[in-house]
Amino acid sequence: MKYQNIRVGHFISRPNRFIAKIEIEGAEETVHVKNTGRCAELLVPGAEVYVQDSQQEAEGWLSDNELLQGEMQMAVSSKSTNIGKKRKTRWDLIAVRKGDRLINMDSQIPNKIVKEWLEQEKWTHNLHNQSDRIHGITKIQPEYTYGKSRIDLYVEAQDRKILIEVKGVTLEENGVVRFPDAPSERAVKHVHELKEALKEGYECYVFFVIQMSGVRYFTPNMDTHPEFKEALKEAAEAGVHVVAYDCSVREDEIRIQDPVPVILENPELYELSQVLVPWYQKARRDLPWRHTTDPYRIWVSEIMLQQTRVEAVKRYYARFMEALPNVNALANVEEDKLLKLWEGLGYYNRVRNMQKAARQIMVDYNGTFPKTYEEIQSLTGIGNYTA
């Protein structure tokens, strides 16, 4: 989505939710703020902002009081229509720079770019490790009435009927983006409506448009509105799809870009995993039994590792596997050879019990390693931990 007539300015103040004072080309101007959220972390004195010159579209200007009353009516009705063609300001606030990141703060744009994106059939996201795409779209209807709410988008695609509630996200801290930045009972209501719509066969989505790029993950804002977090979590558990995409943002353009991880609860654990997993991948030891899912080989390694150093086990494990590669081989090997293969590990009763267990498997499970915890625990020499 492209904007026309963009100019750069610097934020001075915000007298109310609907207007801001911006320095543009050396003059202080009154600018329409297209986002009634708090945006306190964005609109700080001196911040570089980008505004749209709407002078060519205006047929008149409103007084300060008319503008405030009109904008308040728009906020209550949640409609995006203009107040006739009269306006008090020639400028609209579009984007703000926060550090090295440019953030689009136009609250009217997320619905538009999602609709545009769907029209181009670009929706591809990973859901439960399977690629899912909305294709074959035959209908897109904005502001769809469902129950007592208006859902942002209704989509028909082949035999699918899809409801999509779109939420713009501008609140960012250390690469983490959150919604909402202020309590929103309307957002909670919409999430509940989507959850109910599942029962009528609709496919439902909450689509978070991250109005910036380069973020790490999205999480609901527990501090600001815990009820929204709980509603979103319950909806997701019921089957509502919760997705987030970041955007490529320029001074005069915004477009949907890449999927962003959605963390609905315990973001601190996700943060920890982002540190520990890379460290583990780099520092972990290369152990042969970690390269297999064969339960027999894992079982042998578990018994060998009991009270024995890991590095010492590696060579014994390789020797044992070469001679006895499967349950059948272990069940039928002569005891002298078996004990010779175990030599150096000690605790010979362990390997004798292993052979007894292997013979149980041959008789009771036709040579196939049992699959359930209870079955495995019933084998000779296998306790709770090993099972």
Describe each PLM feature range.
Residues 211-267:
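Domain-level recognition of nuclease-like catalytic cores that cleave nucleotide substrates
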Residues 37-50:
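Short nucleic-acid-contacting surface segments enriched for D/E, G, S/T with interspersed K/R
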